[in-house]
């Protein structure tokens, strides 16, 4: 029996990748950033986006739309559709949004992690994409891996270990 070789695609900060089963997509260094894994189980298409900031409308010139959930999620769903995904089948799993800096005055940093979480939830809701699992908040960095053969997302949290969502 011929086993298919599994490729692993990396996603940097303000970056995305889309793949078909059985490939895997991984992003490291999720602090206040959010990793958004979208998966169409029926068509075996997955995508992973690593956003940094909550809202592109706060910026005059957007050099990289993948920094933001309001733009990046749309770009990712379009790329998934090109690979055969149907938007109606897509489910989301999200991770990240940590508060990486312990300032005594939380409002001083405008808690970017929390704002990122809210912005991602809002955009997914607008697109009628349900969030089926999440691992967000806290104050530790995470690595996120999407397995496009089954939609399982592995979260590795610094100093905590591995978890599947």
Curated annotation (Swiss-Prot):
The record's section on InterPro entries has:
CheD-like_sf, Chemorcpt_Glu_NH3ase_CheD, Cytotoxic_necrot_fac-like_cat
Q: Which UniProt keywords apply?
A: Chemotaxis, Hydrolase
Pfam families per the record? CheD (PF03975)
Give me the reactions it catalyses.
L-glutaminyl-[protein] + H2O = L-glutamyl-[protein] + NH4(+)
Record GO biological process: chemotaxis
The record lists its disulfide bonds as: none
Q: Name one GO molecular function term.
A: protein-glutamine glutaminase activity
Q: What is its EC number?
A: 3.5.1.44
- Keyword check for Oxidoreductase, yes or no: no
- Superkingdom is Bacteria
Query: What protein family does this chain belong to?
Result: Belongs to the CheD family.
Q: Which NCBIfam families match?
A: PRK13490.1
> Main role?
Probably deamidates glutamine residues to glutamate on methyl-accepting chemotaxis receptors (MCPs), playing an important role in chemotaxis.
Q: Which PANTHER family match?
A: CHEMORECEPTOR GLUTAMINE DEAMIDASE CHED-RELATED (PTHR35147:SF1)
Q: What is this protein called?
A: Probable chemoreceptor glutamine deamidase CheD
**Source species:** Clostridium tetani (strain Massachusetts / E88)
